[in-house]
């Protein structure tokens, strides 16, 4: 089943909380992430039926308060799960990392990895202390990770993707940063 995701970035934290309360009172949504981000902004990521996401985005389209908004449709359920929590793993042999220019494309990259490869999303970091950038950490065989990165490079521009890396056979102390 596919979902839609809405992303709102408010220029003021207090104003953001007030808007989120309004959205929750008027629409059926699930909160995926809510973070204060640099410099003094509030990032809100939620999932909902496509019609609700579209209606929420319409409300902010004409807003003159410099609220950044975007939506992504057709997101896999596994990607939604990855947005709201880390994947718990005991061990892995290879790690792929994609650094993305913004939150919207971070979600699209994670979804593309899940839909086009046998890799698993380990963790998605967005916005927090990253000035809007995102990181997707994913695991799989070296060949799956390379194929996923090739697919990402084929589907995104160099302006959208900051960098990609593959870490093969990381040491155990490094793995502990990701394993639970």
Q: Where are each of the predicted segments found?
A:
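C-terminal binding/interaction regions
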Residues: 25-30, 44, 122, 128-131, ...
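Short glycine-/aliphatic-rich beta-strand segments at the starts of folded cytosolic domains
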Residues: 1-11, 88-101
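Surface-exposed interaction/gating patches
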Residues: 91-127, 132-141
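Short amphipathic beta-strand starts and helix->beta connectors
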Residues: 22-32, 82, 115-124
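Short amphipathic alpha-helices in soluble, non-transmembrane regions
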Residues: 55-63, 148-155
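Short, low-order "capping/linker" segments at domain edges
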Residues: 79-96, 173-180
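The feature marks the first
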Residues: 1-40, 44-47, 107
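Conserved short beta-strand edge segments in small beta-sheet-based binding/regulatory domains
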Residues: 64-77, 158-169
């Amino acid at each position: 089943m596919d979902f839609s995701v809405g992303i709102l970035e408010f220029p003021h934290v207090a104003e953001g909380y007030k808007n989120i309360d309004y959205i929750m009172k008027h629409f059926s949504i699930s909160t995926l992430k809510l973070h204060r981000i640099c410099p003094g902004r509030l990032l809100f990521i939620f999932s909902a039926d496509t019609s609700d996401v579209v209606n929420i985005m319409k409300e902010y389209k004409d807003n003159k308060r410099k609220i950044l908004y975007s939506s992504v449709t057709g997101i896999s359920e596994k990607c939604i799960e990855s947005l709201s929590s880390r994947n718990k793993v005991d061990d892995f042999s290879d790690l792929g990392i994609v650094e993305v220019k913004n939150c919207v494309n971070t979600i699209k990259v994670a979804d593309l990895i899940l839909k086009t490869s046998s890799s698993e999303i380990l963790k998605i970091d967005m916005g927090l202390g990253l000035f809007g950038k995102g990181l997707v950490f994913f695991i799989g065989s070296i060949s799956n990770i390379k194929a996923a990165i090739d697919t990402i490079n084929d589907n995104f521009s160099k302006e959208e993707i900051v960098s990609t890396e593959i870490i093969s056979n990381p040491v155990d102390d490094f793995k502990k940063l990701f394993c639970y």
